[in-house]
Design a protein with these regions (language model features):
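Trp- and acidic/polar-enriched beta-sheet ligand-binding modules for extracellular glycan
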Residues: 167-168, 193-266
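Active-site-proximal alpha-helical
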Residues: 622-811
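Surface-exposed binding patches on compact interaction domains or structured appendages
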Residues: 23, 27, 50-76
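Beta/coil-rich, acidic/histidine-enriched accessory regions frequently appended to metallopeptidases
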Residues: 269-315, 747-869
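Catalytic cores of extracellular degradative/oxidative enzymes
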Residues: 453-456, 463-697
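A short beta-strand micro-motif common to beta-rich folds, especially ectodomain repeats
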Residues: 86-98
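Disordered, acidic Ser/Thr/Pro-rich linker "stalks" and the adjacent N-terminal cap
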Residues: 112-176, 189-196, 265-269
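Beta-strand-enriched, solvent-exposed domains that form extended recognition/catalytic surfaces
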Residues: 269-442
Length: 869
């Protein structure tokens, strides 16, 4: 084997001055170590330790790779190259001949870092870049300044440049003296905003000496902030200019932070020793002599391990399925900004600071694949939003050998992100990935036994570990999993734990109608540990502080003893399913997601719903009408409407806000128009009562799928003919109105043309550009109309009694300031429209006593389920 040049490094094993002595002074310990630990890097070397002693002595190592040889005045220790991705240790024992004195030195050799010697691909810059349109301050030159925080953007505002098939944004990069371009990276804006992300773009190339452009293909990309790569089948040689025509961009804009033109730096000559293109095995007949001829340190390291049978491809080499993107499902479910798993390709690979070599194959030409490295622990532990949040570093991957440089100080776990933004994931072949120098952390999954998983958590390299169930991908501390993940009977319970979490999501998806209406995703949702706060809906999913792991990892606690933990998990996942504003109106952000919480604790077999007493008290408030008779209850929401009335542009609605000056809540029997609104009930838990009682009653009275149907109806709201769940035929008036208020100008135009005499049309109550924060009322009326059709009854009396429809103005602080503005004429028209459905025979009038029966209806209990382990 070809050896690196060795060197001599001396360590005096004594606390005395570094002078060689044959005999130590009387009373001095015969063998003293000045240092008990020594760390070296992965490269081969020979160490020498000077030993000064007044007795005869021996030296031995407990590992074969540390070879010791006595010298005249010490010991040589030969350490070969460490070809593994993990560090290794050996203990050197120095013993006196009589056995009475022993000193030890721990020698640690670092992991193989051959990838550090690999050159990274280079970028070449365009000499000039131009665009056919630019927003002032967002010039085309920003696409070649090397700064991801700056970007080029098409014009917006009054002079908006609308990107379309017939009006593409065109950017042209001119080159001078560039010989070769192997691939191009399109880097979208990195400020978290998706406006302008390229969604459909054509690349055209003009070579030196040519007069025209040649198309290199049209690419369809998801709008998700990830870097997109274009790699032509052959390098582009001597380019004169490269042009991009953007036919579709997010929000009808076009935006680019950087366009990187890259040249590969890796030669592939020595990689032909492998039998496959993923470099996971040597060709038959490869020998030590062949190994000695290799010069590429990475190839040499990998080949050495394979030749000696010490290299395992477990976790390091795997295939990763394509998934429909989280954004695709968010749009499909009308749940904007609420995302399922954004790091679906769990690898089990631990990434430390430095360079890493990754081979990737089979990325389709029109797709992009990224590697995300998430450091779940970043060295800071707090409890009141003062801890450390996960740090994500993202790398664009391409087919072939990728060299990434991970510069973050804290290690992370690696995830392959391979998503289709158009719902066509099933037609995509998997990509294959090999982390050549990856350190294995492993992950827990249903194909492993509990004993296998227990061993993984015990030997984890990373602070955290992934748990991959059928429905839920979660990340917890490795120590927490090892110590707290117990089954109901107290045994190791990883498999049962996955089944519990999977059941919670299955139940939520059932309530939402995903199974009934074929909306089940091919993507998991997420839960993860954090170091900053008790519980919240974070950037990846539901998150619990790590000090809560003894609760949320214990199956007996979840299933039998801790209804609150079930509520919390379901509550935060419920946020992912919230349909804003269709079923998430002003003041509803912490209410409608709790429909999922309620359903799941019932399905888990808990016999007392979390807020049963609150709902009983709410029923008394609604039915007995005593609480607000004193005239002393002031509505903060109405008060804020009055104080901020100048935010309302419509003259009549501004007058409504002005009329809220005294903000007093009245008793329903005295003034129903100014009675309590459901957003003004004592708490969000009380406000949920009206929904729960309605759901439970009709589930047991002829509408077993009431929730499934109303959710699907809302998902179909924006279809050309609206929902076909509760009705057949054309779009409903209030479906149009709801869509218009959300910002759909075409629906607003259709509404005005179809209903010219409506108060909404005549008084211009809707301004689509203002968005739904400007008024939740259209969404509320739309939902009441839908559920009335589903039940077969005109439900206006019930929802009026519960305060869903009041001719008042409210400005509700609910993750932003949201308005509720219902004028008298809006309410009157809605009641007339609902009465018309009764007159036509489509709906029935609620019989006497039904309102009270619904309001007082009990909970729906289930038998406690069992979960296999």
């Amino acid at each position: 084997m070809k050896k690196s040049v060795s060197f001599i490094w001396a360590l005096l094993l004594s606390s005395l001055p570094a002078a060689a002595q044959d005999v130590l002074p009387q009373g001095v310990t015969p063998l003293l170590l000045a240092a008990h630990n020594q760390t070296i890097d992965y490269q081969e070397r020979t160490l020498h330790f000077d030993v000064t002693a007044n007795v005869d002595w021996t030296c031995s190592a407990d590992q074969e790779w540390a070879q010791t040889t006595r010298s005249t005045n010490g010991v040589f220790v030969h350490v070969p190259t460490n070809y593994a991705s993990e560090s290794r240790t050996a203990t050197l024992s120095f013993k006196s001949a009589d056995g009475h004195t022993t000193q030890e030195l721990l020698l640690t050799q670092g992991p193989n870092n051959a990838a550090a010697n690999l050159p990274e691909d280079k970028t070449v810059k365009a000499s000039v870049v131009t665009a056919n349109n630019s927003q002032s301050g967002s010039a085309a030159s920003n696409m070649r300044d090397g700064d991801y925080s700056t970007f080029w953007h098409t014009a917006y505002g009054n002079n908006k440049f609308v990107v379309s098939e017939s009006n593409p944004a065109i950017i042209t990069f001119s080159f001078n003296g560039v010989e070769r371009i192997d691939y191009i990276n399109y880097v979208p804006r990195q400020d978290g905003t998706r406006n302008g992300d390229f969604k459909r773009v054509e690349m055209l190339v003009q070579l030196q000496g040519e007069s025209g452009y040649k198309s290199y293909g049209t690419f369809v990309w998801a709008s998700n902030g990830a870097t997109k790569s274009i790699e032509p089948s052959e390098p582009i040689l001597n380019p004169k200019s490269i042009q991009f025509k953007v036919y579709e961009g997010d929000g009808d804009f076009a935006c680019c932070a950087e366009m990187e033109f890259c040249v590969k730096s890796q030669g592939n000559a020595e990689y032909d020793i492998f039998s496959d293109d993923l470099y996971t095995a040597l060709k038959p007949g490869f020998t030590q002599a062949d190994l000695d001829l290799l010069t590429n340190p990475l190839v040499q390291s990998l080949a050495y391990q394979m030749l000696n049978g010490t290299y395992s491809t477990a976790y390091r080499a795997a295939s990763y399925e394509c998934h429909n993107s989280p954004q695709y499902y968010s749009n499909l479910w009308n749940a904007p900004g609420k995302y399922y798993d954004q790091i679906a390709g769990v690898t089990g690979i631990h990434i430390e600071k430095g360079k890493h070599a990754i081979v990737v194959r089979d990325i389709p030409a029109d797709m992009s694949v990224t590697l995300k490295v998430v450091a779940w622990y970043v060295g800071k532990d707090g409890g009141n939003f003062d801890g450390g949040n996960p740090n994500t570093t993202e790398f664009s991957l391409r087919n072939g050998l990728n060299v990434i440089n991970y510069t973050y100080d804290w290690p992370g776990l690696a995830y392959i992100c391979y998503y289709d933004g158009n719902g066509n994931s099933s037609s995509r072949a998997p990509v294959r990935v090999h982390f050549i120098n990856g350190v294995v952390n492993g992950y827990l999954s249903r194909d492993k036994s509990n004993d296998e998983m227990h061993e993984l958590t015990e030997n984890a390299v990373n602070t955290c570990m992934d748990v991959v169930g059928e429905k839920v991908h979660s990340v917890w501390t490795s120590k927490g999993l090892h110590n707290y993940c117990k089954s109901i009977d107290g045994k190791v319970g990883y498999r049962q734990y996955m089944n519990v979490l999977d059941s919670l999501i299955t139940w939520e998806q059932d309530l939402l109608g995903f199974y009934k209406y074929d909306r089940v995703p091919d993507l998991r949702t997420m839960a993860y540990t954090n170091y900053t706060y008790y519980m919240f809906q974070g950037g990846f999913g539901v998150s619990f502080h790590h000090d809560q792991e003894r609760r949320v990892l214990n199956c007996n606690t979840l299933v039998n003893n801790d209804e609150d933990a079930i509520w919390g998990l379901s509550h935060e996942w419920g946020h992912q399913h919230q349909m804003a504003p269709y079923f998430n109106w002003a003041g509803m952000s912490e209410i409608t997601n709790n429909m999922n919480s309620y359903y799941n604790i019932m399905r888990m077999g808990y016999k007392n719903s979390r807020d049963a007493n609150n709902w009983k008290n709410t029923a008394k408030i609604i039915l007995n009408d005593d609480t607000y008779k004193d005239g002393k209850h002031v509505s903060e929401h109405r008060k804020q409407a009055y104080l901020n009335r100048n935010e309302v542009s419509n003259v009549k609605l501004k007058a409504l806000a002005t009329s809220m000056k005294d903000s007093i809540i009245h008793a329903y029997s005295e003034n129903p128009d100014l009675a309590v609104a459901f957003q003004e009930l004592p708490s969000v838990d009380h406000s949920l009562g009206g929904f729960v009682r309605f759901y439970c009653y009709f589930r047991d009275h002829g509408c077993p799928d009431i929730a499934k149907d109303w959710y699907e109806s809302l998902r179909q709201n924006n279809n050309a003919n609206g929902s076909q769940v509760e009705k057949k035929g054309g779009v409903d008036k209030y479906e149009l109105l709801c869509s218009a208020q959300i910002g759909d100008n075409a629906k607003w135009t259709e509404f005005k043309q179809s209903y010219p005499q409506s108060v909404w049309t005549k008084n211009s109550y809707v301004t689509p550009s203002a968005g739904w924060y400007a008024n939740s009322v259209p969404a509320i009326l739309n939902w009441i109309r839908k559920v009335s059709r589903l039940t077969g009854y005109n439900m206006v009396p019930y929802f009026e009694k519960w305060g869903f429809i009041r001719p008042i103005a409210m400005r509700v602080g609910d993750y932003g300031n949201k308005w509720y503005l219902m004028s008298e004429d809006m309410l009157s028209e809605f009641k007339e429209d609902m009465d018309a459905l009764v007159d036509s025979g489509e709906l029935k009038v609620m019989p006497e006593g039904m309102l009270e029966d619904i309001t007082n209806y009990g909970d729906k209990y289930f038998t406690r389920p069992t979960f296999p382990n």
